[in-house]
Amino acid sequence: MIQPQSHLNVADNSGARELMCIRIIGASNRRYAHIGDIIVAVIKEALPNTPLERSEVIRAVIVRTCKELKRDNGMIIRYDDNAAVVIDQEGNPKGTRVFGAIARELRQLNFTKIVSLAPEVL
């Protein structure tokens, strides 16, 4: 469960290292975001000499959360960290690689480009 002011790791090579959620895209008073939700975030930490800079406002899709994700078949998935992938306005990832495992639910939410870049889909 990601809410405003939550810090997330970045799971791609876009140049950002850490994000802070400032808004959840969707309903106007939505409190929490889960895997597959799009958030508006600010870059808190970035690598030098990359297109993304610190304090830049971007969009990202959440790919891992510490909060459990319960599937219809009864399986429960939980990750060690909260992580997101930086995307552009069309929903395409800004990076060319995705690090770590991501959830299978992203494929059903039409983030197929992110799923194809991921090394492992759980």
Swiss-Prot record:
Keywords from the UniProt entry: Chloroplast, Plastid, Ribonucleoprotein, Ribosomal protein, RNA-binding, rRNA-binding
A biological process term (GO) from this entry: translation
GO molecular function annotations of the record: large ribosomal subunit rRNA binding; structural constituent of ribosome
SUPFAM superfamilies linked to this entry: Ribosomal protein L14
Pfam families: Ribosomal_L14 (PF00238)
InterPro entries to which the protein is assigned, alphabetical: Ribosomal_uL14, Ribosomal_uL14_bac-type, Ribosomal_uL14_CS, Ribosomal_uL14_sf
GO cellular component, one term: chloroplast
DNA damage recorded as keyword: no
Major localization listed first in the record, in broad terms: plastid
Cellular location(s): Plastid, Chloroplast
Record's keyword annotation contains Cytoplasm: no
Role noted for this protein: Binds to 23S rRNA.
Subunit and partners: Part of the 50S ribosomal subunit.
Family membership: Belongs to the universal ribosomal protein uL14 family.
Full protein name: Large ribosomal subunit protein uL14c
